[in-house]
Amino acid sequence: MCASLNEVKKNETYGVSQKGYNDNFSESEGVLHGSKSMPTSMKNMLQSPTMVNMCDILQNKEAANDEKPVIPTTDTATAGTGTEDISSTQSEETDQNSHLIASEILEGTFKDISYKEYANFLGNDNNNQVLTEFVKLLSPLPSSLLETLFNLSKSIYFIAEAQNIDRILECLSKEWIACHPNTHWKSGYKSCHIVLFSLLILNSDLHNNFQVDHKKIKFSMVAFINNTLRALREENEYEELKIYSREHLIIEELSEYYKTLNETPLPLCTESRTSINTSDNQSSLKRFSTLGSREFSTSNLRSVNSNSTTLYSRDGQVSVREMSAKSNKNFHNNHPMDALYLKESFDDGLITENGSSWFMDDLILISKKSLPRKYSKRDKDQVAAPKMTSKRNKSFFGWLKPSKTTTLIEHTSRRTSLSYLNKDSEWERVKIQVKEGRIFIFKIKPDVKDIIQSSETDSATIDYFKDISSSYFAYSLLEAEAHVVQDNIIIGSGAMKSNVCNKNTKRKSGNFTVSFPENINGPKLVLEFQTRSVEEAHKFMDCINFWAGRISPVPLTQFEAVSNAEYGWSDKILTEHASLNLKNIVVSEWKPLLGLELLYEDAKDVEMVELKERLKELMNFTRQLGIWIDKHNEIKDKLVEIWSFDDNYFEAVMNNWNSRYLYMNNQYKKRLSYLKALQKAMGSVQF
């Protein structure tokens, strides 16, 4: 049978046989042998890049491409009568056919090849026009590079040879710069290309559980930022465009990307496209502060060194938080609990007012994966989670290999704090009370149907909820912080926006998280709750941040303490470096101090102050911290000048600078949350 006209036109457009995708390698190129579960076309893959060789791969890409054999394309007639008209007509037809093929690939209806070969097809040298049309169909691209990468991963089955994916990312970078010319990246599409490349490496490192021959811990936020910055600095346009002058903005942006990607891995598109949006929520990502605002999600830098954002520690074992050991012991034994704040006259009239900054009580839902299991009254509540491998995969594209599930979210959702972003998340009914500096959680038994609605705090009511609960907990809100999930979600464009809006409009529920920092007794913990409305989620957030801000002292010690260690910016270094032998200087690793307020959950040594005084302290502290952040920014150029004589010294000092910068920004964000909550509460107080 003869091929259809459309098929002929498509073949003329991409000019390459389907079996030719893997024929571009020379025998000398390294190959990564796929597993038996991989498609036949994927069994021999180009050795994938890693964080270590990322710069070399990007720099040598053009030379490598020159060595590849040229795939013949269909000749274009240019001789005879009407040559220009013929060429013009054929060019127009080619553009139309390229657009047609790109549209079908985006829709998953291009049948000439398997949908699993789409990325290889687009990245082929001879199909640049189709690739360009495909990327244009993704426009307008989001202002976040990570969200742009998410959109791409949802639009195409992103398993392909390394050089083909690299070409796709390069084209995507150019289109992103065209859409967003006024960012701190200026016209530097090569720099954006490096960031996209680095994000793929990070995704593989954080979420790929394939076995490797050696065991290493996963990249920390600081390591990811420093590796990416190193690659950027080696890119000529980075210097030519003077992008480095706004490097602190890039650090903030990369830190946001790390936190989001750590929580939500890149999705894997399927042929049916039914799992592209995975509960419509993959089109929703956290808001990124790409313009350098200090308003970005908080995360204690010390907890960044652990990949655990929930109850799970780095090795994957269940690690139940012990920060509230004393509260829990007293709570379970019906003993009085120590006061965490200085009670004032106005507190009596507000402490039982449900829905206020002083008191929140309701039956809501908690994400099952984040629910603590300690102090369970039934053995079935004490089952440990399966052990997860922490081996690091050195393959950049390891995440692209087929898994047993339709999306990579399935195996990693247990470690994310945002169950809102996963349609398969399981939720448990809980009774929640937030009062007097603590949050009380009662996990309701599944067989309990009729529950007495009561917000009383007397012992009889508490005993009733203990009886109908399989487990219950009490947590101090010292240094805790709450966020409404919907406040940190941005909606994509087009159909994705419609899907998300329709779904959220229908259910009208709200979600909020409560983060407890790492302390001497355990790692960072994030609990996620779901309420009947976003308004109620905001009320819980205000109440939690009010009490956290009221009982948490400002961390002046972290910034006022003088250390004998040299981090690279002591007064002596900054003023006398010309007369010093810098090679004899011992540069120590900068780490934030673990304050006394985090050593004990019910610390009696923590000074209790009046509400007005705490508010004043927070106002002064945030103002002073802003000054310290500005001063820290001011010394960066000087540090670059002083330490550029040696790569090792330079890297150590810049690592320290980045670590301290991130820590200060995180503290700034948290204290602003406290300040806002206290100011709102003060409006209802009569002095």
UniProtKB/Swiss-Prot annotation:
Q: Where would you find this protein in the cell?
A: Cytoplasm; Cell membrane; Bud neck; Bud tip
Q: Which GO terms describe its molecular function?
A: guanyl-nucleotide exchange factor activity
Q: Name one GO cellular component term.
A: cellular bud neck
Q: Which InterPro entries match?
A: PH_GEF_YEL1, Sec7_C_sf, Sec7_dom, Sec7_dom_sf
* Residues recorded with modification Phosphothreonine: 290
Tell me how this protein sits in the membrane. Answer: Peripheral membrane protein
User: Where does this protein have compositionally biased stretches of type Low complexity?
Assistant: 73-83
Q: What does this protein do?
A: Guanine nucleotide exchange factor for ARF3 required for localization of ARF3 to the bud neck and tip and involved in actin patch polarization.
Q: What is this protein called?
A: Guanine-nucleotide exchange factor YEL1
